[in-house]
Curated annotation (Swiss-Prot):
Domain S4 RNA-binding: 107-181
Highest taxon in the source lineage: Eukaryota
Protein name, UniProt field: Small ribosomal subunit protein uS4
Family: Belongs to the universal ribosomal protein uS4 family.
Annotated region (Disordered), positions in chain: 161-189
UniProt organism field: Caenorhabditis elegans
Gene Ontology BP term (one): translation
PROSITE patterns documented for this protein: RIBOSOMAL_S4, S4
Compartment list: Cytoplasm; Nucleus, Nucleolus
GO MF annotations, alphabetized: rRNA binding; structural constituent of ribosome
Amino acid sequence: MARLKTVQSKVTKSPRRPFEKERLDQELKLIGTFGLKNKREVWRVKYTLAKVRKAARELLTLEDKDPKRLFEGNALLRRLVKIGVLDETKMKLDYVLGLKVEDFLERRLQTQVFKLGLAKSIHHARILIKQHHIRVRRQVVDVPSFIVRLDSQKHIDFSLQSPYGGGRPGRVKRRTLRKGDGAGGDDEE
């Protein structure tokens, strides 16, 4: 039986020039600052930013009172404000063109966990997320690149099943508790 062809949309775009020193240094700095796994994660965010800026540029070419510009422009601005990339005081399409990659990287769950002080470092935050220790509202999230909305930001916490969140203690703690219980039982007899 023939396999069905699956159509997948692009999520990254590799750079045109593979060995450009300034770009390589900039990407390496972003990877270190935000604790990313590889360059592909940087390229994914750059591609998202490029799509947003392209939409804003196309809308800016239309007239101010054009219904398409009003409707789609407001939708784009509301979406960017909702995820916290754009400030509410700057709700104009001109400000969308000034967005940087860092604005999007700041909204990742990994960065937010580190900024809230739940992790000791940005790399520790990634490990906590991948090991199912972090939840957003009631949902455990194990994707470090999860984009946190502004209204969900105050609901980031440790999972209820996690040892950090009051769940079952970890392996070492259970062993020390057992040793403590065993030693206490021998003294009484």
